[in-house]
């Protein structure tokens, strides 16, 4: 039986997530000054305008050339992995689409603005989690789905 690629679905997911990410960042950048914050759910969720020229928690701040190179390599590896390993695995294809969209979304910010627009600000059990954006969420969900897909794949091979 021929294993399919779900190209139209994965392209739709990638493009939709990328557009949503870029539009939300543009709205925040245009309508809020850096540091402005609005409460969505008191003591839990805020929209806070923030800029980050590093990775999560400001790691490697100001190392744009490093991020450019790493992102290009990662995007290439994701395409390779999609073609070579994800055939017939719908969940893995969705996961790779989310990873690709997230990496590309933050890459676009770094290329155009030299920094990433972050705005989702959460406090979980009094821990003030680092401010993040839609691309970061896409990357996180993509990683979780890759792990789930690999778990299911390893279980199938044992049966």
UniProtKB/Swiss-Prot annotation:
The chain crosses the membrane at residues 4-24, 64-84, 88-108, 131-151. It comes from the Bacteria. InterPro entries: Peptidase_A8 (IPR001872). Keywords: Aspartyl protease, Cell membrane, Hydrolase, Membrane, Protease, Transmembrane, Transmembrane helix. Its EC number is 3.4.23.36. Pathway: Protein modification; lipoprotein biosynthesis (signal peptide cleavage). The active site is at 118, 136. One of its GO terms (cellular component) is plasma membrane. Pfam families: Peptidase_A8. It catalyses: Release of signal peptides from bacterial membrane prolipoproteins. Hydrolyzes -Xaa-Yaa-Zaa-|-(S,diacylglyceryl)Cys-, in which Xaa is hydrophobic (preferably Leu), and Yaa (Ala or Ser) and Zaa (Gly or Ala) have small, neutral side chains. GO terms for molecular function: aspartic-type endopeptidase activity. Belongs to the peptidase A8 family. It comes from Staphylococcus carnosus (strain TM300). GO terms for biological process: proteolysis. The keyword Metal-binding does not apply. It is an enzyme of class 3 (hydrolase). It is a multi-pass membrane protein. It is found in: Cell membrane. The gene is lspA. This is Lipoprotein signal peptidase. PROSITE patterns: SPASE_II (PS00855). This protein specifically catalyzes the removal of signal peptides from prolipoproteins.
């Amino acid at each position: 039986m021929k294993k399919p690629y779900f190209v139209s679905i994965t392209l739709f997911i990638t493009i939709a997530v990328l557009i949503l990410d870029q539009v939300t960042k543009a709205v925040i950048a245009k309508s809020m000054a850096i540091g402005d914050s609005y409460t969505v759910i008191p003591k839990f969720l805020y929209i806070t305008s923030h800029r980050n020229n590093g990775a999560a928690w400001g790691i490697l701040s100001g190392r744009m050339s490093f991020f450019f190179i790493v992102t290009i390599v990662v995007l290439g590896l994701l395409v390779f992995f999609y073609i070579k390993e994800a055939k017939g695995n719908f969940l893995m294809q969705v996961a790779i689409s989310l990873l690709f969209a997230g990496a590309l979304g933050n890459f676009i910010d770094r290329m155009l603005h030299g920094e990433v627009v972050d705005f989702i600000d959460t406090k979980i059990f009094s821990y003030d989690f680092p401010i993040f954006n839609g691309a970061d969420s896409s990357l996180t969900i993509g990683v979780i789905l890759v792990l789930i897909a690999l778990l299911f794949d390893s279980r199938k091979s044992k049966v």
